Regions:
Chain A
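Structural signal for hydrophobic packing residues in well-ordered secondary-structure cores
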Residues: 64, 68, 84, 88, ...
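N-terminal active-site beta-alpha-beta segment that forms phosphate/nucleotide-binding
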Residues: 43-121
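Residue-level recognition of conserved structural "scaffold" positions that shape functional pockets
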Residues: 22, 38, 80-82, 161
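Intrinsically disordered, low-complexity terminal tails and inter-domain linkers enriched
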Residues: 2-47
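Conserved phosphate- and dinucleotide-binding cores of soluble alpha/beta proteins
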Residues: 1-5, 108-276, 280
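A conserved C-terminal secondary-structure "cap"
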Residues: 272-300
């Protein structure tokens, strides 16, 4: 059995694959260069190369401008929301799947149920209240979801890889609350660390969390718009709502639309006015590194 | 007689009701599992990331229960251990993963390769499971929710169906909605911070779906960090999440939720969660672990002792006391 966990510091790794690295991996190691090292950064914190986690967190945080309630899991969505609280959306509140609202954690939480989220929180709800009143009642502006696969309508698979649900080649964790987040949030943001044709697929192996178009095909109208933003290591895909496909609307500096289309398993549409994403600024990186995640629990 | 009855002077103090005898439902873990968990039973084990009744799961393994149907929203390490212990033939769940820390080796072998034997699996979403408990607790025939429209899950789970609302929808049109069936486990087991000897169970922090799961069940076992005096419970009755009449056994089992946590008692053992992917990946290593930590220990006290005080010191938490509220009293 492993050494004791500590609530105040990142844990000693017990396996290289899951260990937070002491030194951040550079974006160039697992993604495109962002030009951040020779960008407008001036602060000392920003001289280090930008990691893919930092890049995705910063880009996601900017998308939260004007939003009030965010349903988020731990990891990049937490970082993005915490950064947004310090920048574009000071009033934004995270609702955690564990039932915590208005958390004021003393340390960066390691899970959605970390004890530090509960101590000092404004409210802790039961599961019927969280899923029934808060989510299904329509109180969430933005839900963050991840998935193993996404298709052009923003339908998500988090259940199985393979042809058969009952004998899959890989059994994934399954729906959890993702179906509820998808059906009931006003809109859904998806963060994908790796933009590949296997994950951005023409046909899902299994549709766990359906977007509104699939629901409407069954004659049932869901509350929300489904996935409206997909933030990846290559750029941003977006759709406004029912009847719209995800389109490429922005790329990171140095990434071409053709690169993104080649990394997408369907015939990806590209917006006429394709934007270039501004690299993380010195101020955003400083806040992320010094205030949001100084222990580099997630910024690996 | 009422307050307006002229025979009772307004100033007379109301007679104190006769004290009701308090049942003592405290049992050892061994006796509680022996009495309330039988081969072939449907057993709900709840606790949403917090207060997971791991020690009860271990005792079920020690006593060699077979052919259980386990009902649990987040089927995590304790379920993987019960699978490795050969106790489970069917799983009803909405999340089959080791938190966000990795995989459940035994569960994946059972589902992906039917090794060492197939596992019957009935899958819902989290709120689908919550609604099954809500329907079960209220003895309703089904419970509606807006989750499944367009999902492939309904095509692999016959329990997920639709009904047409008898009332027109917001647009005046006929409205169809998905429903899930009630679940009424033979027994529900939950873990809590404290209870009195009768089973009035107090939980703070994440309260999850414990009350619904207990009320849905025919029998309920509550495992607690400590059994407290009646007066402690009665000093703060709103803290009672499960009343005594819904509880059949109270088991004192300190640190019985490890590797999950008990708010205010000990922290989550995150390192253990991360190590489970490695332990459970190799069936031989997993069986060695089960032999050493579950089958090789007489009870949970031995498991706790084997972890060692140094380990527990690393999971210790400091105080963060709530301010008392004033319930008031009649003068």
């Amino acid at each position: 059995m492993n050494a004791a966990a500590s609530a105040t510091a990142p844990h000693a790794p017990d396996g290289a694959s899951t260990a937070p690295a002491d030194a951040p991996a550079t974006v160039s190691a697992d993604g495109p260069a962002t030009g951040s090292t020779d960008g407008p950064a001036t602060g000392s914190a920003s001289r280090e190369p930008v990691t893919s986690s930092e890049l995705l967190s910063v880009v996601a945080s900017r998308e939260l401008a004007g939003r009030r309630t965010v349903f988020a899991g731990i990891g990049l969505p937490t970082l993005a929301t915490a950064l947004a609280q310090l920048t574009v959306a000071p009033e934004v509140e995270i609702v955690y799947e564990s039932g915590v609202c208005g958390a004021h954690p003393s340390h960066l939480p390691e899970t959605i149920a970390d004890a530090v989220l509960i101590t000092g929180a404004e409210a802790v709800l039961s599961m019927p209240a969280l899923f029934g009143y808060v989510l299904q009642g329509g109180h969430i502006d933005v839900g963050f979801l991840g998935a193993a696969q996404i298709d052009k309508w923003g339908n998500l698979n988090s259940s199985v890889i393979g042809d058969r649900w009952d004998r899959p080649s890989v059994r994934l964790p399954g729906p959890g609350g993702a179906m509820e987040v998808m059906a009931n949030s006003r809109e859904v943001f998806v963060v994908m660390r790796r933009h590949t044709p296997r994950s951005f697929t023409a046909e899902l192996d299994f549709c766990t969390s359906p977007g509104p178009d699939r629901a409407l095909a069954e004659g049932i109208r869901p509350l929300g718009a489904g996935v409206t933003r997909v933030i990846t290591d290559l750029g941003i895909l977006a759709r406004a709502g029912v009847g719209e496909e995800l389109r490429l609307v922005a790329t990171h500096p140095g990434v071409t639309a053709e690169q993104v289309r080649a990394a997408t398993g369907w015939d990806l549409q590209v917006a006429d006015a394709l934007a270039t994403i501004e690299p993380p600024t010195a101020s955003e990186l400083r806040l992320l590194r010094e205030d949001v995640d100084p222990g580099r629990v997630y910024l690996r | 007689m009422g307050p307006d009855d002229p025979a009772v002077p307004a100033t007379a103090p109301a007679p104190a009701p006769a004290a009701r005898p308090v049942a003592d439902k405290t049992m050892t873990m061994r006796d509680a599992i022996a009495a309330f968990v039988h081969d072939g039973d449907t057993v709900a084990i709840e606790g949403f990331t917090h207060l997971i009744p791991t020690a009860a799961g271990h005792e079920i393994v020690r006593q060699g229960r077979r052919n259980l149907t386990v009902v649990r929203m987040t089927a995590d390490i304790v379920v993987d251990q019960m699978l490795a212990g050969g106790c489970v033939s069917k799983l009803v769940s909405s999340f089959v993963g080791n938190s966000s820390a990795g995989s459940l080796g035994e569960l994946r072998r059972r589902i992906e390769h039917a090794l060492p034997e197939p596992l019957e699996f009935e899958e819902y979403s989290h709120y689908g499971m919550v609604c099954r408990y809500l329907a079960g607790a209220q003895r309703l025939p089904f419970y509606p929710l807006r989750s499944y429209a367009g999902s492939d899950l309904a095509s692999v789970n016959d329990g997920i169906r639709t009904v047409t609302s008898p009332y027109p929808g917001p647009d005046g049109q006929e409205e169809r909605i998905h429903v899930v069936p009630p679940v009424n486990p033979d027994v529900t087991i939950v873990h809590a911070q404290r209870a009195d000897r009768a089973g009035n169970t107090q939980i703070w922090g994440l309260t999850g779906v414990q009350a619904e799961a207990v009320f849905a069940a025919r029998r309920a076992v509550v495992v607690v960090e400590e059994v407290v005096d009646d007066e402690v419970v009665r000093s703060d009755p709103n803290r009672t999440v499960i009343p005594a009449h819904a509880v059949d056994a109270v088991v004192a089992c300190p640190r019985g939720a490890h590797p999950s946590f008990a708010q205010g008692y000990y922290d989550r053992d995150n390192a253990f969660y991360r190590s489970w992917s490695h332990i459970s990946k190799d069936p031989e290593r997993l069986q060695e672990w089960m032999q050493r930590w579950v089958l090789g220990t007489r009870d949970h006290a031995e498991y706790v002792a084997m972890l060692g005080e140094e380990h527990w010191a690393g999971l210790a938490v400091g105080d963060a006391l709530s301010l008392p509220v004033n319930y008031g009293r009649r003068l």
